[in-house]
Amino acid sequence: MKIVLQRVQQSHVSVNQHIVGQINQGLTLLVGISPTDTDAELQWLARKCLDLRLFPDPEGNPWQASIQDIQGEILVVSQFTLYGDCRKGRRPSFSGSAKPDQAEQIYEKFVAFLRQSGLKIETGQFGAMMQVEISNDGPVTLLLEREAKPA
């Protein structure tokens, strides 16, 4: 699984010019799913997103508070293109991403893990063409990756 995490002042996602998910201060997560992702990766990454200290504390000291500490909001958007491989040719190959049916199940599990936090969690529409508007704060953008361990 790959996640592009962005600290945001606000963010929203639209499908056919209708907003389907929007948040104020918090995190926008662009999530790519691989066919080997297991519950262990999902839980680890959900916990990492919830626990990372990316926000200032009430005194303004940077990197002191997590999304949970500030009771922020999270927008989760599926993005299979994170597994795009551009090493050959002029078109990316997406063979490293999970097939849509499998990816949707894994994505929904990941969202469910985040929802256990009690924070406001909004999502895009899985598999749809979406427009995402992000007001990046900082900017703070991180790439989180966790692949299944070989058996």
Swiss-Prot record:
Domain note: A Gly-cisPro motif from one monomer fits into the active site of the other monomer to allow specific chiral rejection of L-amino acids.
HAMAP family xref list: Deacylase_Dtd
Organism: Picosynechococcus sp. (strain ATCC 27264 / PCC 7002 / PR-6) (Agmenellum quadruplicatum)
A GO molecular-function descriptor: Gly-tRNA(Ala) deacylase activity
Keywords of the record: Cytoplasm, Hydrolase, RNA-binding, tRNA-binding
Name of the gene this protein is made from: dtd
Assembly notes: Homodimer.
Cellular component, GO annotation: cytoplasm
Enzyme class, broadest EC rank: hydrolase
Function: An aminoacyl-tRNA editing enzyme that deacylates mischarged D-aminoacyl-tRNAs. Also deacylates mischarged glycyl-tRNA(Ala), protecting cells against glycine mischarging by AlaRS. Acts via tRNA-based rather than protein-based catalysis; rejects L-amino acids rather than detecting D-amino acids in the active site. By recycling D-aminoacyl-tRNA to D-amino acids and free tRNA molecules, this enzyme counteracts the toxicity associated with the formation of D-aminoacyl-tRNA entities in vivo and helps enforce protein L-homochirality.
Name the UniProt record assigns to this protein: D-aminoacyl-tRNA deacylase
Motif (Gly-cisPro motif, important for rejection of L-amino acids): 138-139
Family: Belongs to the DTD family.
Catalyzed reactions: glycyl-tRNA(Ala) + H2O = tRNA(Ala) + glycine + H(+); a D-aminoacyl-tRNA + H2O = a tRNA + a D-alpha-amino acid + H(+)
Subcellular location: Cytoplasm
EC number from the UniProt entry: 3.1.1.96
Principal location: cytoplasm
This protein's record includes keyword Hydrolase: yes
S-S pairs: none
A Gene Ontology biological process term: D-amino acid catabolic process
UniProt KW Nucleotide-binding keyword: no
